[in-house]
Structures are given as C-alpha cells and as structure tokens.
Amino acid sequence: MANRPLFKRKKFCRFTAEGIKKIDYKDVDLLKDFISENGRIIPARITGTRSYYQRQLNLAIERARFLALLPYTDQH
C-alpha cells in the first residue's frame, strides 16, 4: 500500500482549457504529445481528453500518418 500516491491529479481536457475548436492534422507538434513512444495513440482515460476532441484527435493522427507527417510505428 506504500506505492499509492498521496493525491490523484485531476485530469483535464487540454483542448477545452486552451480554447482549441478544431484539431488540425498539420499540427504535428501537438499530435506528438498524444502518441506513445512506440507510436500508439494514448487513450482518453489516460490523457483526460473529452470524447469530442478524442475523436478529432484520432482522425487527425490517422490523416497525418497517411500523409507521412507522423510515423505509424517508432522505428520502421
């Protein structure tokens, strides 16, 4: 039981806090924050992103991968 954190940090939606309305597939720096080290999309339950923005985020990452702006895997 000693491994439990003293307090749990409240998750918040980054897009709601910053006032972002639409997620653009060309904003690679923003999209990289929501991709794990091995190239997988981080789920909303971990990032705290609202479902409305998570769907936009998934679509933007898929489009960026298709256009070779983002890699599909970490090393290929």
UniProtKB/Swiss-Prot annotation:
Function recorded in the entry: Binds as a heterodimer with protein bS6 to the central domain of the 16S rRNA, where it helps stabilize the platform of the 30S subunit.
Record-given protein name: Small ribosomal subunit protein bS18
Species name: Nitrosomonas eutropha (strain DSM 101675 / C91 / Nm57)
InterPro entries with a match to the protein in the record: Ribosomal_bS18 (IPR001648), Ribosomal_bS18_CS (IPR018275), Ribosomal_bS18_sf (IPR036870)
Disulfide bonds listed in the record: none
GO molecular function: small ribosomal subunit rRNA binding; structural constituent of ribosome
Assembly and interaction partners: Part of the 30S ribosomal subunit. Forms a tight heterodimer with protein bS6.
Family: Belongs to the bacterial ribosomal protein bS18 family.
Pfam family, one: Ribosomal_S18
A GO CC term attached to the entry: cytosolic small ribosomal subunit
GO biological process: translation
Segments traversing the membrane: none
NCBIfam families: S18
Keyword terms: Ribonucleoprotein, Ribosomal protein, RNA-binding, rRNA-binding
PANTHER family in the record: 30S RIBOSOMAL PROTEIN S18, SMALL RIBOSOMAL SUBUNIT PROTEIN BS18M
PROSITE patterns: RIBOSOMAL_S18 (PS00057)
